[in-house]
């Protein structure tokens, strides 16, 4: 019997052993440099340092062999040719670029890094780089009292990770996770430090099991790995936006997804028959509830064999997919890595024949138990296997499918360790490595194979890929959902910091299973969660077999009406959200942001985890406890306008706000703008109108960027997009708008403006021309239709 709280589920506790003796790197004796690489010869090995940009520096040390400057699959950036000066004294060597200074203490060897304003970023004190004879490597850094730590990818708990210890080892948590569960499905050995209003970051490029220890009572923190080298990058910032731009320049940014992927997704483990899928789709249509995607979980397959479908359950799958697509609904099937051992199964036959499966060093194939039973696992570290796997997705594209859901790709195995034997050997494109070293990138490389295969097969259309497992850089290929949560209020609460920290780790396209995967939800919880989901980047309702259904109508008309309202609101907000996705594609900035991201000088924002920003100027303060209609919310500097009532709240302070079950508290910063579109049943329906809502201030200037393209192809990469810069100058009784556009895309919609907090006498000009406006005295809005 499941309890009513997930506190009953406790993470596994490892036996605590005495700390292994660590050997310090020792003293530096000599140094040299060639072609932008600086080498420092120390007692126990060579440290190599290279500037990747003026504001990114890489430091590598391998105590067990040659220090290599090769990279993991996470890194896509080639180092720039950065001019750096060198200065040596008796005690130190100093390397200086235009934006960073690296000071190397000689005895013992210790690293300090400053920005170009002399701000200390990271420093080593009593301890520095060290290792053990068992193969562990570790790096200690000084921890300031003012330090706050964010990122680390997919982690439960609070937003600020100071005081926590986290492990990176992709793990399928059989019992749905709770706020103390660690590790989870993804590994992102990266974090951002915010200190006194400024930010910097560190990426530890090591694919072994890694640990980040901020739980220490001392003034040092540590990051370590079970094997490999110390190899990390320091990002100089100085703002959180700068750090994320630097990190995603190194590890890559997400491609723009198809617009349909931003719509509402409905899923269940499982919709088990063609008839059930048709009934679900038809109910959405009859109830006029927008929908873009229905998922097929594992029951669509023939005996859980990937690249098959059960012809008894789905006798006309191709026709089903075509019929739904005509109605604006796409089908996304699940694809796991496990390939059933079956001599008559063509995928298994091909894998055996071409030596595509993971093997032991002796040459025998590794088998593990997963949903199909005894199964082999493709070795995605081999480019031939990735190509083969990608090509196999023609099975799906021939059916009309444009999106894939990768699951069980940690890889998950039904055994005591929950995964593949760490002694398995991966080909690694001719440089064999153990699974112990490459475990954390298995799901990443499956994602690469899937995305690239689908992209090629779709002939210019954008594919959509959803993944459970991943590593730093996974944003290049996939959206991420946070795995098997539960239908508890605490899991709704937990989803906010999880998604915000994923966004701070470069994964802008993410979201939880709305409503909770396991356990039985209720109408109030589902409603409050759907309100939040309408503003998370990825919006999917998903629940497990054996538990209460969670479709929008599952709890009766009272809740259905409210849920429908917020799904429709999601579609109305898609122009604004799509603009933010374009920003994420271009700069790495998250769609869903913690408040400190925009207000790093405001220490009141550092620990806020129960409210978030959508972009820079929209604040969401959801209700996330039962039978609650009021909450306290913090508002940063500026004035904030209640989206529903128009009430203006002064920022820089806390406010008690009211929100009945029908209301999600949404606030727009005065002086900013948002672009809204038509309410429609699917993203397949074109917008006829686009309205830029300007929230008038009494003075000052602001710029809003509106982005659009065809939403389906990659033509935006060749300039076929619209980026409209809308510059607004506010007077006490005037609003002057200047527009400037770039790109070749010609949208079908007509542009309008709505000036909030205006009067009938407010003068409005657009590009120098005075406008005739319609005034709504009740809402105090001036409406202007642009020609």
Swiss-Prot record:
PROSITE patterns tied to this protein: GLYCOSYL_HYDROL_F31_1, GLYCOSYL_HYDROL_F31_2
EC number(s) per entry: 3.2.1.20
Keywords attached to this entry: Glycosidase, Hydrolase
Catalytic activity: Hydrolysis of terminal, non-reducing (1->4)-linked alpha-D-glucose residues with release of alpha-D-glucose
Any Pfam family hit: Glyco_hydro_31_3rd
Annotated active site: 407, 410, 484 (proton donor)
Any one Gene Ontology molecular-function term assigned to this protein's record: carbohydrate binding
UniProt KW Hydrolase keyword: yes
Class of enzymatic activity (EC top level): hydrolase
Superkingdom per UniProt: Bacteria
Keyword presence, Transmembrane: no
SUPFAM superfamilies reported for this sequence: (Trans)glycosidases, Galactose mutarotase-like, Glycosyl hydrolase domain
GO BP annotation list: carbohydrate metabolic process
Family listed: Belongs to the glycosyl hydrolase 31 family.
Quaternary structure note: Homohexamer.
The protein's name in its UniProt record: Alpha-glucosidase 2
Organism: Bacillus thermoamyloliquefaciens
């Amino acid at each position: 019997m499941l309890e009513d709280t997930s506190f009953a589920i406790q993470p596994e506790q490892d036996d605590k052993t005495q700390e292994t003796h660590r050997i310090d790197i020792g003293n530096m004796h000599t140094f040299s440099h060639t072609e932008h690489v600086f080498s420092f010869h120390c007692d126990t090995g060579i440290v190599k340092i290279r500037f990747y940009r003026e504001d990114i520096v890489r430091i590598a040390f391998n105590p067990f062999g040659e220090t290599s400057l090769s990279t993991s699959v996470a890194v896509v950036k080639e180092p720039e040719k950065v001019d750096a000066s060198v200065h040596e004294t008796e005690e130190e060597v100093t390397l200086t670029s235009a934006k960073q200074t690296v000071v190397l203490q000689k005895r013992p060897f210790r690293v300090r890094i400053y920005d170009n304003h002399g701000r200390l970023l990271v420093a080593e004190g009593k301890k520095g780089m060290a290792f053990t004879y068992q193969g562990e490597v570790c790096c200690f850094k000084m921890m300031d009292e003012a330090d706050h730590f964010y990122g680390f990818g997919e982690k439960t708990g609070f937003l600020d990770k100071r005081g926590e210890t986290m492990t990176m080892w992709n793990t399928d948590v059989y019992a749905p996770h709770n706020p103390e569960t660690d590790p989870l499905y993804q590994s992102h050995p990266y974090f951002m430090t915010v200190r006194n209003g400024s930010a910097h970051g560190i990426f530890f490029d090591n694919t072994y099991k890694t640990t980040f220890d901020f739980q220490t009572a001392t003034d040092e923190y540590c990051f370590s790995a079970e094997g490999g080298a110390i190899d990390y990058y320091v990002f100089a910032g100085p703002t959180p936006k700068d750090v994320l731009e630097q990190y995603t320049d190194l590890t890559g940014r997400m491609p723009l997804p198809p617009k349909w992927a931003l719509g509402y997704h409905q899923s269940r483990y499982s919709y088990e028959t063609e008839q059930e899928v048709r009934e679900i789709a038809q109910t959405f249509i009859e109830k006029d509830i927008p929908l873009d995607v229905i998922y097929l979980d594992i029951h669509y397959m023939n005996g859980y064999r990937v690249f098959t479908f059960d012809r008894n359950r789905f006798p006309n799958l191709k026709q089903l997919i075509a019929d739904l697509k005509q109605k604006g609904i796409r089908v996304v099937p699940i694809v796991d890595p496990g390939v059933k051992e079956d001599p008559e199964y063509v995928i298994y036959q091909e894998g055996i024949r071409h030596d595509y499966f993971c093997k032991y060093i002796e040459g025998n194939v590794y088998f593990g138990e997963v949903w199909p039973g005894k199964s082999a696992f493709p070795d995605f570290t081999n480019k031939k296997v990735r190509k083969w796997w990608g090509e196999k997705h023609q099975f799906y594209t021939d059916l009309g499918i444009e999106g894939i859901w990768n699951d069980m790709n940690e890889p998950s195995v039904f055994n005591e360790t929950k995964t593949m034997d760490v002694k398995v050997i991966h080909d690694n494109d001719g440089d064999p490595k153990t699974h112990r070293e490459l475990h954390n990138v298995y799901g990443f490389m499956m994602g690469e194979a899937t995305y690239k295969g689908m992209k090629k097969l779709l002939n210019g259309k954008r594919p959509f890929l959803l993944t459970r497992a991943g590593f730093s850089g996974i944003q290049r290929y996939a959206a991420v959902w946070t795995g098997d949560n539960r239908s508890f209020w605490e899991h709704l609460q937990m989803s906010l910091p999880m998604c915000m920290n994923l966004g701070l780790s470069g994964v802008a396209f993410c979201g939880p299973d709305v409503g909770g995967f396991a356990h039985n939800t209720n109408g109030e919880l589902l409603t409050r969660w759907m309100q939040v989901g309408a503003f998370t980047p990825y919006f999917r309702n998903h629940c497990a077999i054996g538990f209460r259904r969670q479709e929008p109508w599952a709890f009766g008309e009272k809740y259905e009406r409210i849920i429908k309202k917020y799904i429709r609101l999601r579609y109305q907000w898609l122009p604004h959200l799509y603009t933010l996705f374009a920003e994420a594609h271009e700069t790495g900035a998250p769609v869903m942001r913690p408040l400190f991201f925009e207000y790093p000088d405001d220490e009141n924002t550092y620990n806020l985890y129960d409210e978030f920003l959508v972009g820079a100027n929209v604040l969401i303060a959801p209700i996330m406890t039962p039978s609650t209609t009021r909450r306290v919310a913090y508002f940063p500097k500026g004035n904030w306008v209640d989206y529903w009532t128009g009430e203006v709240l002064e920022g820089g302070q806390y406010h008690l706000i009211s929100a009945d079950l029908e209301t999600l508290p949404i606030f727009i910063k005065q002086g900013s703008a948002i672009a809204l579109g038509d309410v429609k049943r699917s993203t397949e329906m074109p917008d006829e109108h686009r309205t830029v809502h300007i929230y008038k201030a009494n003075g000052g200037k602001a710029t809003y960027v509106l982005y659009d393209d065809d939403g389906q192809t990659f033509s935006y990469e060749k300039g076929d997009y619209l980026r409209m810069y809308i510059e607004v100058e506010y007077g006490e009784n005037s609003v002057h708008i200047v527009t400037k556009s770039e790109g070749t895309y010609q949208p079908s919609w007509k542009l309008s403006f709505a000036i909030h907090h205006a009067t009938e006498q407010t003068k409005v000009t657009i590009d120098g021309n005075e406008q005739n406006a319609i005034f709504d005295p009740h809402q105090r809005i001036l409406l202007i239709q642009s020609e």
